[in-house]
Structures are given as structure tokens and as C-alpha cells.
């Protein structure tokens, strides 16, 4: 209760007010009829968006009020709103490392853990921003200018750099919200997004904290203890066979789920084409990228993330049950 009233509620109110000022709707009105610049009629959804978006980000939930998530101009209207939402995703997971050091009265340990997490995050940001700002070489070959970088699947009001930053921010946590299409990012960018979720330790999320990172600490302490010939200890407790068995199972379970799921999907795609066709065909991009789409889907589900390579037609019986 205290975490809700002292942390989540105040932060949600602050972020909500900022989003309202930036243009996010807040009310209980139904669809609004508007006339577009082309002269056609369109119905635009409204509702309590500014109340839902803050807790979606602060709680590392990621489920958007609108179907296209934070790509929608009413959910993420401006560049400043985009920055605030990025901050909202990271603030509590980042604070977990400091809270760990504070409550155990070992602040240096908390700082070192935070430093490792931050380093991994910044490496991912640098790679993705440089990849997306550099543009698509295939489009360069056509002689088409890419002054704003690789803009496929991205919002003009945000640009390629902000979308690349968000893609790393949402995958180093268990958030999963998006402000652009991850399936349209450059190959190395997509790899970094997948790698973040496969490691599944950077920052974590609200509810589980950095539980997976703690597992790797236990394994590292045990191995280092064996290397120097002393009994491994962490936080004053011996790390013995029982702890190692639990940590090993937890560490191996994540890749096991991902690989088994991907292998099953790939097998069905090749050996049961009639079943795949009955579900709409699954892949819009067969080949290497199609395999990446299936791998990303199971990686995202196993990491409790929720983002996806949306070239995959995953709203089917098979994908809903296997991912669930």
C-alpha cells in the first residue's frame, strides 16, 4: 500500500499533468468526429488517456490506451512528452539498485550494480541511435536522401534517434511499450533489442526488480570463489550447492523457453504448412527475418516484455496459447 501511495500515485499525478499540458486527452468523451486535411471524415478515440499512460510506463506494464501504443499522437504527442515517458519507464527500475544499497547499508555495492546496468544500457543506446541515424543502406543505393535517418516505421514528430532510444529503454526493462515499429529497425538494432530481453537482467521492472541480475550475481560469486579457493559468500551468506542449483535452473529456464518455443514454431512452419495457412500464414517476411520474428516473439514473452516484430501474424490460436 505504501509503495502505491508514496511512490506510484505521486509520480503518476506528476507525469499525468505533464502529458495533459502537452496535449494528451483526459476525459470520458467518446469518439470525436473530425474532418481530415484530405476532406474525409474520421472518428478519433479520446478518453482518460493521460490517467492511464503514466501508470502504464511507471509500472513497466507497457499496454497502450491506443492500438499503436506510444506511437499514437494522442498518447505521446510531443518530443518532450516522449522524454517524460522514457524517464517514467526507467525511474523505478533504476531506483531499485540504489534502494538495494541503501537498505543493506552497502551503498557501494548498489552503485557498482547500477554502474554495470547503466553501462549496458548506454552501449545499447549508442548502437541503436547510430544505426537508425545512419539510415538504410539499401535505400541509399536507390539514391534517396535519408537526412533524418532510417524513418521506416517511425513517427515524423519523434524521429529516428528518439525511437532508437525508446527501443532500448523498453527492452532493458519489462515494459514493452513502443513509439515505433521494432520490426522496421536496422538489423543490428533489432539484435540489440532482442539481446536485452534474452539477457533479461538490465534494470528489470516493477514487481520483480532485478531478480534475474541477482541470479547472475550468485553464479558469478560461486565461480569466483572456486577460482580463488575459498567458500563463496554473498551478503554474509554462504553460496553452496543448493543455491547454485536454484540459480542455474532460473538462469537456464529463460533460454530454454525461448529456444523450445522458436523450434516448435519453425518446425510447424516447415512441416505443417496447412496448419500455418489455416491461421493466416504467420509470416509476412519468410526467410531469415521470419525466423527472427518468431525468435523475438518468444523472447519478448519469456522476458515479460510484450513488444514484438509485427511482421508476424501472432493473433492466432497457436501464438496466443504458446506465448501465454
Can you say where each PLM-predicted feature lies in the sequence?
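Membrane-proximal intracellular helices of multi-pass ion channels
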Residues: 1-324
Amino acid at each position: 500500500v505504501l509503495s502505491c501511495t508514496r511512490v506510484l500515485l505521486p509520480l503518476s499525478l506528476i507525469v499525468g499533468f505533464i502529458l495533459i499540458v502537452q496535449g494528451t486527452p483526459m476525459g470520458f468523451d467518446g469518439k470525436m468526429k473530425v474532418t481530415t486535411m484530405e476532406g474525409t471524415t474520421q472518428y478519433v478515440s479520446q478518453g482518460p488517456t493521460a490517467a492511464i499512460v503514466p501508470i502504464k510506463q511507471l509500472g513497466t506494464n507497457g499496454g497502450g490506451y491506443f492500438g499503436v501504443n506510444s506511437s499514437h499522437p494522442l498518447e505521446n504527442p510531443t518530443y518532450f512528452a516522449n522524454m517524460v515517458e522514457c524517464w517514467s519507464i526507467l525511474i523505478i527500475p533504476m531506483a531499485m539498485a540504489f534502494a538495494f544499497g541503501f537498505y543493506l547499508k552497502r551503498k557501494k555495492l548498489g552503485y557498482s550494480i547500477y554502474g554495470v546496468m547503466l553501462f549496458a544500457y548506454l552501449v545499447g543506446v549508442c548502437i541503436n541511435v547510430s544505426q537508425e541515424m545512419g539510415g538504410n543502406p539499401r535505400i541509399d543505393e536507390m539514391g534517396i536522401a535519408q537526412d533524418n535517418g532510417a524513418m521506416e516505421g517511425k513517427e515524423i514528430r519523434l524521429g529516428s534517434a528518439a525511437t532508437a532510444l525508446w527501443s532500448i529503454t523498453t527492452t532493458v526493462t519489462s515494459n514493452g511499450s513502443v513509439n515505433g515499429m521494432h520490426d522496421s529497425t536496422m538489423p543490428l538494432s533489432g539484435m540489440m533489442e532482442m539481446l536485452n530481453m534474452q539477457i533479461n537482467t538490465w534494470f528489470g521492472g516493477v514487481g520483480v526488480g532485478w531478480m534475474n541480475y541477482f541470479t547472475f550475481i550468485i553464479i558469478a560469486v560461486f565461480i569466483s570463489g572456486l577460482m580463488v579457493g575459498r567458500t563463496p559468500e554473498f551478503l554474509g551468506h554462504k553460496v553452496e550447492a543448493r543455491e547454485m542449483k536454484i540459480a542455474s535452473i532460473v538462469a537456464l529456464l529463460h533460454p530454454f523457453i525461448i529456444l523450445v518455443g522458436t523450434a516448435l514454431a519453425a518446425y510447424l512452419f516447415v512441416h505443417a504448412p496447412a496448419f500455418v495457412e489455416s491461421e493466416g500464414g504467420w509470416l509476412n517476411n519468410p526467410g531469415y527475418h521470419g525466423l527472427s520474428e518468431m525468435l523475438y516473439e518468444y523472447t519478448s514473452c519469456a522476458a515479460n516484455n510484450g513488444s514484438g516484430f509485427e511482421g508476424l501474424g501472432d493473433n492466432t490460436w497457436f501464438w496466443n496459447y504458446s506465448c501465454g
